[in-house]
UniProtKB/Swiss-Prot annotation:
Organism encoding this protein: Akkermansia muciniphila (strain ATCC BAA-835 / DSM 22959 / JCM 33894 / BCRC 81048 / CCUG 64013 / CIP 107961 / Muc)
Assigned protein family: Belongs to the RbfA family.
Function: One of several proteins that assist in the late maturation steps of the functional core of the 30S ribosomal subunit. Associates with free 30S ribosomal subunits (but not with 30S subunits that are part of 70S ribosomes or polysomes). Required for efficient processing of 16S rRNA. May interact with the 5'-terminal helix region of 16S rRNA.
Record's protein name: Ribosome-binding factor A
Name of the gene this protein is made from: rbfA
Gene3D superfamilies: 3.30.300.20
Statement: the UniProt record of this protein carries the keyword Cytoplasm: yes
Alphabetized Pfam families for the sequence: RBFA (PF02033)
């Protein structure tokens, strides 16, 4: 991937994220644009989103993909490119895996026996 493509990917990631926050509502759910990958000719772009919260990720993706034209138009007004890529949204489940891992660690911590205070260890000498 070229340096220019990397810059376009980052610019689109920010603009798509802003558009989603401003124009869409996902009650009780956080939707984050993780990464954007455009083709070298800028005709197509894959948008990887993380979904954490009450809504099913499939519902979020369905809503975003069904309204990709609105998102593309909003991005085209703010970003000047020869072509505005046709966007397709895909799930990046790393955010949900991170939340699940934190919850698992908290559960393990609750079930571990408590360590004796540091002072109690020194009193036995």
């Amino acid at each position: 991937m070229s340096r220019r493509t990397d810059k376009v990917n980052e610019l689109l990631r920010r603009e798509i994220g802003t558009t989603i926050q401003r124009d869409f509502e996902f009650p009780g759910t956080i939707v984050t644009v993780i990464e954007v990958e455009v083709t070298d000719d800028l005709k197509e772009g894959k948008v990887w989103v993380g979904v954490v919260g009450k809504m099913a990720p499939s519902q979020v993706l369905e809503k975003l993909n069904s309204r990709h034209g609105l998102i593309q138009s909003a991005v085209a007004r703010r970003v000047v490119l020869r072509n505005t890529p046709r966007l397709t949204f895909r799930l990046d489940d790393s955010a949900q895996r991170g939340v699940d891992l934190v919850n698992l660690l908290e559960d393990i911590d609750k079930n571990l026996p408590k360590a004796p205070p540091a002072d109690a260890e020194n009193d036995g000498e």
